[in-house]
């Protein structure tokens, strides 16, 4: 598949899956966030983690606040992504600390310490769509594709999604697209072999 074909294929997946996700009820997304948090918090990799890069959900994404609240309650250092000069950087954040809204709707910490990518034990990755093999289609900015190779090889990557975002067909992926190790929905945990 050429790079142009790959971009077109991913764009088609984004359109289809985002339409399905956008049609979900906001109250269901809040409940899904709590259920997903419970499942993620039980994963052995997360239980052992001291530093987690999460993300601040926006739009029709499931709520990540229950997960972030619980991690902070456990004493885990939680970071949120910040885009600096086109690159993703993790900055520490605790609920209640100030954030600023980005041009695409996500919230980034205003302050917070920069987290060394090698210190991150778990990366909670956003995804528009994922397949059972751990391939993910993001929003198209390539931020995580550039960031993930800078993390440790043993850093655990987990995608948290609504059931509508878990697709059964093989998603389009290029050589630079790193897979996630696990997918968590409100109903299940899928272990992948990236």
Segments and roles (model prediction):
Residues 2-119:
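N-terminal active-site beta-alpha-beta segment that forms phosphate/nucleotide-binding
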Residues 58-60, 128-132:
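Short glycine-rich anion-binding loops that position phosphate/pyrophosphate groups of nucleotides
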Residues 1-8, 12, 19-23, 74, ...:
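Surface-exposed, charge/polar-rich loops and edge strands
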Residues 140:
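Short polar/charged helix/loop
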């Amino acid at each position: 598949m050429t790079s142009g074909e790959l971009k077109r294929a991913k764009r088609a997946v984004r359109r289809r899956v985002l339409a399905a996700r956008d049609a979900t009820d906001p109250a269901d997304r809040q409940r899904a966030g709590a259920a997903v948090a419970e499942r993620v918090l039980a994963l052995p990799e997360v239980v052992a983690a001291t530093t987690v890069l999460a993300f601040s959900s926006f739009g029709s994404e499931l709520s990540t606040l229950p997960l972030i609240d619980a991690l902070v309650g456990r004493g885990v250092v939680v970071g949120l992504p910040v885009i600096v000069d086109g690159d993703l950087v993790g900055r520490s954040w605790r609920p209640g600390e100030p954030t600023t809204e980005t041009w695409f709707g996500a919230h980034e910490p205003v302050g917070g310490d920069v987290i060394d990518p090698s210190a991150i034990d778990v990366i909670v990755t956003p995804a528009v769509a994922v397949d059972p093999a751990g391939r993910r289609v993001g929003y198209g900015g390539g931020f995580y594709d550039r960031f993930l190779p800078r993390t440790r090889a043993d850093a655990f990557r987990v995608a948290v999604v609504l059931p509508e975002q878990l697709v059964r067909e093989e998603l389009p992926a290029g050589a630079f697209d790193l897979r996630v190790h696990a997918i968590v929905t409100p109903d299940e945990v899928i272990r992948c072999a990236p």
